[in-house]
Regions:
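P-loop NTP-binding core
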Residues: 1-256
Length: 256
């Protein structure tokens, strides 16, 4: 049975989508069968994996409204070992369209469960907000991975996110756990990055991944080319760090 990991942080610009794309790609590169579920209406994970988000017939939006099956929503073999359930701006309307729908928080849970046995990992990219879509993603997931940018306001809003995770666990998904925290955009040249890492480690009781994702120009360039970092620049610091993170994620599952 595949592990379902939601990548979430309502604070934008923390490397959430970058992590969703590149962790997924590096898991696939390591021989894991991966499904990427893009639940962000911006659709940046979809386009960052080379899929034209404005030219797909079925997206998460159609799936949630019952207009297509989960199999019809999946684009297969976007990369070796990697499939995608795409998203685009239409998904922004789901919040209103699903008002009054019974058990709407469980829609993704029910649909993903139909195919989870086909995969080793299902990576769910959440929107940068604590919305119905985020709740849907968490209700469908086993764990939540939280990227935190190495900057002054790193912990801003994190307590609210953890509160939401605990609320979903209490009311909707009793098996939901924290996968852990991963530091992103680390700049070894600055004292601030080091201070942020030390501060978070001192104040956060959650699991923290050893791998730290550096601030890397090649990571920033890759999405505009529609490929993950391990394909865009296989030997870059960004590619190596996401390979290490993927290895940690794989072995954490084996250790449990």
């Amino acid at each position: 049975m595949g592990r379902i990991i939601a990548v979430a942080n309502q604070k934008g610009g923390v490397g959430k989508t970058t992590t969703s794309i590149n962790l997924s790609a590096c898991l696939a590169e390591a021989g894991q069968k991966v499904l990427v579920v893009d639940v962000d209406p911006q659709g940046n994970t979809t386009s960052g994996l080379g899929v034209d988000k404005n030219n797909v017939e079925n997206t998460i939006y159609e799936l949630m409204l019952g207009e297509c099956t989960v199999e019809e929503c999946i684009i297969t073999n976007v990369l070796d070992n990697l499939d995608v359930m795409p998203s685009n701006v239409n998904l922004a309307g789901a919040e209103i369209d699903l008002i009054g729908v019974d058990e709407r928080e469980y829609i993704l849970h029910k649909e993903i469960n139909k195919v989870r046995d086909n995969y080793d990992f299902v990576i769910v990219d959440c929107p940068p907000s604590l919305s119905m879509l985020t709740v849907n993603a968490m209700t469908a997931s086993d764990t939540v991975l939280v990227p935190i940018q190495c900057e002054y306001y790193a912990l801003e809003g994190l307590s609210q996110l953890i509160h939401t995770i605990n609320l979903v666990k209490k009311r909707l998904n009793p098996d939901l756990e924290m996968e852990g925290v991963v530091f992103t955009m680390y700049d070894a040249r600055t004292n601030l990055s080091l201070q942020v890492v030390e501060n978070v480690k001192e104040n956060l009781k959650q699991t923290i991944y050893k791998t730290i994702i550096p601030r890397n120009i090649r990571l920033a360039e890759a999405p505009s080319h529609g490929v993950p970092i391990n394909i865009y620049d296989s030997k870059s610091a960004g590619a190596e760090s996401y390979r290490l993170l993927a290895d940690e994620v794989i072995h954490r599952g084996e250790d449990e």
